[in-house]
Design a protein with these regions (language model features):
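PLP-dependent amino-acid enzyme catalytic core
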Residues: 1-250
């Protein structure tokens, strides 16, 4: 059986696939342009990078984790994702020097829809609230009712559809087509690439963590989800650190 922990492409570049030769086609790493939008329109406080006492129990030198629980008061590690995309559109309309009053109604004529297992939908709902847009979040039947109720507190409409995430996404895509809404998924597929910009929002937490961490980590652990979050952070980690850390997707 092959050893799944061994990366056959380590220090060899990307596989010989034309799609992967230009990384910008699948992921963004332009953190400065993302930071400009986020700081102008969202103004989130930096989340803490915490050194854990668990390292001693595990017998390792140090263990750090990025605590996103209080970012924008969402309790979500994807607080800046979909909200970044809406912030960028708001900035394009009213400018980077716009007042809070100008920003809060800047997308009043826009309607966004997505499917989510939780965190991404929360970011879209919050972004829509901040910029006066409409947000419709499709959740599958497996998502707890309490989470749907929480999303509603941000002014979003919640629709339960489908037995799983894939079916709820199909329902969201159909709703977008039927109602002329903007589909804003945090994933991509053939013919749909808006998810790349959602993923770019995650660069904020990655850049904060890497810049604050006093050492070059040996390992970076990332939550998997549907792949957008780890793809974004992993790509930026390779840009920032090179091949040094081993990246583990959990």
């Amino acid at each position: 059986m092959a050893n799944a922990t061994i990366n056959e492409y380590f220090k060899k570049g990307f596989p010989n696939d034309p799609i992967l030769q230009d990384v910008s086609m699948i992921v963004r790493t332009d953190v400065e342009s993302v930071r400009e939008v986020v700081h102008a329109c969202l103004k989130p406080e930096k989340s803490p990078l915490i050194q854990s006492d668990l390292a001693q129990k595990l017998g390792i030198d140090s263990l750090w984790f990025k605590d996103e629980r209080n970012r924008m008061n969402l309790g979500s590690f994807k607080a800046i994702g979909a909200s970044y995309v809406l912030a960028r559109e708001a900035a394009a309309r009213v400018g980077f020097e716009a007042t809070e009053e100008e920003l809060k109604n800047s997308l009043h004529d826009k309607s966004y829809v997505t499917a989510s297992a939780g965190n991404h939908g929360l970011s879209l709902a919050n972004g829509a609230r901040l910029f006066g847009a409409k947000a419709v979040i499709y959740l599958s039947k497996t998502v707890p009712t309490e989470f749907g109720d929480y999303i509603k507190t941000f002014g979003a409409e919640v629709v339960v559809a489908g037995e799983n995430y894939e079916e709820s996404m199909q329902a969201a895509a159909k709703a977008a087509s039927d109602n002329d809404w903007i589909l804003l998924s945090d994933s991509t597929w053939e013919g749909y690439s808006a998810g790349i910009d959602v993923m770019a929002g995650y660069l904020i937490m990655a850049s904060e963590a890497f810049e604050e961490c006093p050492i070059t980590p040996t390992h970076i652990f990332l939550q998997a989800g549907i792949g957008g979050y780890p793809a974004s952070v992993a790509a930026y980690a390779r840009k920032y650190y090179g091949d040094a850390p081993k990246i583990v997707i959990v």
